[in-house]
Every structure is written in C-alpha cells, then in structure tokens.
Amino acid sequence: MGAECCKQLCRSLHPYAADSLKDSSGRRVDLGTEFSVLTDTSDDEDQVGAGERDDFVQKQLTTPLLSDKNSAIPLTVVTPIQLGANKGGGKRTSSLKSAKNGAGVKKKVRAL
C-alpha cells in the first residue's frame, strides 16, 4: 500500500513547480507556503549569548532533582510478603498454620 500511495503522489506532482502537488479535488497545493513555519530558523537561541546558555545548562546539570532530603525516595522499603507452603509437602505443622491464617511476614526489600 505504501508503494501505491507514493506512486500516486509522484504522478500528481507538477513539472513546473518542485514544491507543489494536487489535492483530492485537483487544485494545486503550494508546499512552500504550507510549511514555511518549519523552514524559518529564527528563534530565541540566536538572541541568547553563548555564555548565558552555557551557564543555564551547567546550572541544570548541577541542580539536584530533589533538593530536600525528606522528599527523597527511600532505597529500602518495608513490604509485606506472604510466605506459604503446600499441604502435605513434608513441612512442619507450624509453617502450615502460619500459611493458613494469611498473616504476612514483613521483611526489608531493597527497591530497584
């Protein structure tokens, strides 16, 4: 399907204008006016000095994302983990009892 679309587009290009083609109703579409915004190169970077831009980049690289230690994400979190056993698997009855009542055992797990 992509090859068919490409062939249809190439056939509708006008030989006298390299940046125009026909739309579905047969009218000429001038791509130069449609995409002039994309070809304009004037923006704020031309007006900002190189020293100011370098200072801004350096500040962004050295500023910590979380400046307050209380707002930092802890690396070790207490997470409840359910330990269970199969019935009749040769386990002790005390481990079977703890698996039946569903109480989770809290262990420290390191967050990745």
Curated annotation (Swiss-Prot):
Organism superkingdom: Viruses
Bilayer topology: Lipid-anchor
Post-translational modification: Myristoylation and palmitoylation (probably on one or more of the nearby cysteines at the N-terminus) enable membrane-binding and Golgi apparatus-specific targeting and are essential for efficient packaging. Phosphorylated. Phosphorylation does not seem to be required for recycling to the host Golgi apparatus. Packaging is selective for underphosphorylated forms.
Gene Ontology cellular component list: host cell Golgi membrane; host cell plasma membrane; membrane; viral tegument; virion membrane
Region (Disordered): 84-112
Record key words, sorted: Host cell membrane, Host Golgi apparatus, Host membrane, Lipoprotein, Membrane, Myristate, Palmitate, Phosphoprotein, Virion, Virion tegument
Lipid-conjugated positions (N-myristoyl glycine): G2
Disulfide feature: none
Pfam families: U71
KW Membrane (keyword) present: yes
UniProt-annotated location(s): Virion tegument; Virion membrane; Host cell membrane; Host Golgi apparatus membrane
Residue ranges the record marks as coiled coil: none
GO biological process: viral budding from Golgi membrane
Main location group: virion
Family membership: Belongs to the herpesviridae cytoplasmic envelopment protein 3 family.
Functional note: Plays an important role in the cytoplasmic envelopment of tegument proteins and capsids during the assembly and egress processes. Also participates in viral entry at the fusion step probably by regulating the core fusion machinery.
Quaternary context: Interacts with cytoplasmic envelopment protein 2; this interaction is essential for the proper localization of each protein to the assembly complex and thus for the production of infectious virus.
Protein name: Cytoplasmic envelopment protein 3
The species this protein was found in: Murid herpesvirus 1 (strain K181) (MuHV-1)
Record lineage: Viruses, Duplodnaviria, Heunggongvirae, Peploviricota, Herviviricetes
